[in-house]
Amino acid sequence: MKKKCIAMLLAGGQGSRLRSLTKNIAKPAVPFGGKYRIIDFTLSNCTNSGIDTVGVLTQYQPLLLHSYIGIGSAWDLDRRNGGVTVLPPYSASSGVKWYEGTANAIYQNMNYIEQYDPDYVLVLSGDHIYKMDYQQMLDYHIAKQADATISVIEVPWEEASRFGIMNTNENMEIVEFAEKPANPKSNLASMGIYIFNWPLLREYLQIDNADPHSSHDFGKDVIPRLLRENKRLVAYPFKGYWKDVGTVKS
């Protein structure tokens, strides 16, 4: 069943900086405002953006998250063709093989993506609080004829070293990207939301997987490699409210 764009939602985070809040549950399952959990924001965004096929990649303490997501009916994602699918790490040979990084998590689930033969893959994080129309970002990605588009937000300078930081030219093309730099040159931060042309992403996940020196992370490995090889990466400026639930304070 061909899909124009599917989403892969990274919900495996242990959230060790959140201390006792996440002792027994994955960070995206942390309760927010009583009856919601943090992952609700991203799943609702998918539904409201017309993205009806979402793979949720879980690994740390996944049971609560699995039962919470269920078949996705809370977000109108209980579809016969697509819908929401929980994708825990599986091992072909022995024991459980943990996802080794954000890029490795997607790499291990390329078969899931292939069955939809998408033109584009939207990569999301399940531990952010924000409202966003991903369809607008996809339209922007297509209009810019980009290989990859990264959603960005201006953060306070004193917080910039917590994020992937990029410099862009006047056309919003990314010319430089540094993951958590000690001395940031810009305060334009990656929101951990990416759109890739699937054929390109597939190729670069395979290259990354074969690299013994890679930590298999989008921010540390895949994005810098795409830049080095002069792929067209553009930044999509987001103006709304966004919080990365990385620390108890936020």
UniProtKB/Swiss-Prot annotation:
Superkingdom of source: Bacteria
InterPro entries from the UniProt entry: ADP-Glc_PPase, ADP_Glu_pyroP_CS, NTP_transferase_dom, Nucleotide-diphossugar_trans
Pfam families: NTP_transferase
Molecular-function GO term, any one: glucose-1-phosphate adenylyltransferase activity
Keywords from the UniProt entry: ATP-binding, Carbohydrate metabolism, Glycogen biosynthesis, Glycogen metabolism, Nucleotide-binding, Nucleotidyltransferase, Transferase
Pathway(s) of this molecule: Glycan biosynthesis; glycogen biosynthesis
Catalytic activity: alpha-D-glucose 1-phosphate + ATP + H(+) = ADP-alpha-D-glucose + diphosphate
Transferase listed as a keyword: yes
One BP annotation, GO: glycogen biosynthetic process
Entry EC number(s): 2.7.7.27
NCBIfam families, per the entry: PRK05293.1
Function: Catalyzes the synthesis of ADP-glucose, a sugar donor used in elongation reactions on alpha-glucans.
Sequence similarity: Belongs to the bacterial/plant glucose-1-phosphate adenylyltransferase family.
UniProt protein name: Glucose-1-phosphate adenylyltransferase
Annotated source species: Bacillus caldolyticus
